Amino acid sequence: MGLVMNKRKYIFPLAVAAFGLWACGEDNNSTTACVTEQCLIDQYGEFNADSANKAMEDSILAAQGGSSSSSWTVYSAERPDPLEAGHEMELGESSSSGAEVTCGPQTPWACVSSSSLILPDASSSSHRHPTSSSSVDVPPVSSSSVVVVPPTPANDFVEDHRSECQIGNIPTSVNNAKLPDPFKGLDGKRISTKDEWKCRREEIGAMYEKLMFGTKPRNPEKVEGSYSGGKLTIKVTDKGKSGSFSVKISNAGTKDKPKPAMIGFGGGMMGGCGSLGNATNGLDIAQITFNPDDVAPESGGGMFFQLYNQGQGTIIAWAWGVSRIIDALEKTPEAGIDVKHLAMTGCSRWGKGTLAVGAFDERIALTIPQESGSGGASLWRVGAQVNRQKGKQFVQGLNSAGTEGKWMISSFKNYDGKENTLPFDQHILVAMVAPRALLILDNAGQEWLGEVPSNDCGQASKEVYDALGATENYTYSQEGGHGHCQLPNGQFDEVKDFMNKFLLGKDAKTGKIVYTKNTEQINWKKSDWIDWETPNLN
């Protein structure tokens, strides 16, 4: 297998399968389906979605006197799957043809009583990120909607899985002019399953921490949150030291009705560098403003380095700060934030930080780095080639990016001019976000951002999403003709689609490579940079 798991966590959600009384007509006898964990185990030998669906079939058949054929499926092909993200079922809802839906074996979702549902904790939605391993999307249940909720493994809502994985020896140098294989483990063996990706991405993270970013401290002794007047204060205590910082929250929900949220560096959606501007109009989500200078200013010092003075770069310190925000939100439901539906955005240097946040914290459901350039979603090897061809630093090079803003550890600049010796390239950092949702926004009109290395990174990163069967969770969008960090109208649709789909659970088309106004599709020659096969991970 190549990658070793020390342990496995299969945690089932508190919301177990619940199927309503058989009530197609007033004169029918009522039969209650087996809905408890123990009942499913006793009668069907297991507690999972298959046993829950079998219990529902048996309940409906029993109510019909066992006369129905066993060939019908639980979810009718003529009706949207009630587990499909964003589809909340109403009792008495009409079919697509406009006819009233009748309770029956082809329409079991019409037979469910809201009183029979075992609801999740009201403080947060219980459903998980799309395309995470071994589960399905379960839309939130409101008092006016009915959803069949089979018992499935819950989302491992954790920062990462580093403690579960054995990390091998990390090379400091290779000889490879091509893009490193994201599927080859440190032991030289390629992964073949989606489950193995969990530890492969941890290997990648460990490489980045050792060679580029510095160590991201994990599991501080205590994280506390307090919320008042639209401000969340986060206090972190670790190894005998304490520090605190605050973030602003606007358009928040309530403890009983929390809202999805976008965390924005330096203002994010609300203005400043990284603004998504009017693209977010009409979307009922909360906005969390995080000033990274409150944790680790680029000038040096700051709360993070008072707690951990280990030579890290500021980018990993910013990522640590966002992780502590999420910790505090989990413990502060009165802030009105649905922590299971968090997005992260930022532009330029904060775009680099955004990518690091999404890569190093699996609790981020949607990552939107904007115009991140070198050190973000842009390939070091391709950028170096472009500069050699131009005979000058046309694209920001490794030495410049490696020293500006103290983003990276000081030794990383030693790879300048030796990019082919890097054991990784940025397509692998991008891949760490997979299979969670990722929208990369790029600007073809700013030379130093690197139109070609950014495009090629977008193309190469897609290989991992394809391998994981998560193509629809990934979009790379490039447009020119606008200023740096000024989101153009041509990219509004991508932003809205991703937010609607991955934060609000609505139907939207995602999963594409997009070239819009004032840019041309770049000739991506895969064979020039990739000498490995993309597996179909099962």
Which residues does each predicted region cover?
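Flexible loop/turn segments at secondary-structure boundaries
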Residues: M270-G272, V295-P297, G351-G353, S374-L379, ...
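Loop/turn elements at helix/coil->beta-strand transitions in domains of secreted/extracellular proteins
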Residues: K257-M262, G282-Q287, V339-H341, E362-L366, ...
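Primarily recognizes the serine-hydrolase "nucleophile elbow" in alpha/beta-hydrolase
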Residues: I325-K390, K418-E419
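Bacterial Sec-dependent N-terminal signal peptides
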Residues: K7-R8, L14, G20-G104, C111-A122, ...
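N-terminal secretory signal peptides that target proteins for export/translocation
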Residues: M1-K7
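Mobile cap/lid helix-loop segments that gate and shape the active-site cleft of serine hydrolases
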Residues: P369-L429, G450-G458, V464-T471
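Cap/lid segment of the alpha/beta-hydrolase catalytic domain
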Residues: I263-P333, G373-Q385
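Alpha/beta-hydrolase-fold serine-hydrolase catalytic core, especially in secreted/extracellular enzymes
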Residues: V149-S246, N251-K257, A434-L438, N443-N538
